[in-house]
Amino acid sequence: MGNRTTTTFTTLTGETEHMEKKLLLGAEAVAQGAIDAGISGVYAYPGTPSTEITEYIQRATEGNQPSVHSRWATNEKTAFEAALGVSYSGRRSLVCMKHVGLNVAADAFMNAAITGVHGGLVLVVADDPSMHSSQNEQDSRYYGRFAMIPILEPSNQQEAYEMV
């Protein structure tokens, strides 16, 4: 669950405070950000590297609570629809998939962009725009532009945590 260290520092007012630091990989930072943001559901279709996000949440103490519904889906479309349903109920959800999975979820994704959401909904797509380690080249940012939704591109683990 990442390496943890505790740092003690003195504030400008002279008070001593303790801050826990976690050293996380990018997928772990996304997962921890979702947990700390208070997600109610995480849904995914297995496919590396997006699988690690859901697995981290399932292993984490905070993510393994009855208040966090976590499921592997039959495909990316059903994963997106489950997360969208949680969002329609006013709660926060996360859905994770590989780049080719967004093709499968495209119908639900585009319709959600039109109808909107009521709670938070974060879609994490693990892209491979230069076909480094996958069977095809795809840049899912074009889906985001077409749907006119915000596209977040963290450049490090801290940004990934904060953006989620």
Language-model features: locations:
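Thiamine diphosphate
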Residues: 7-157
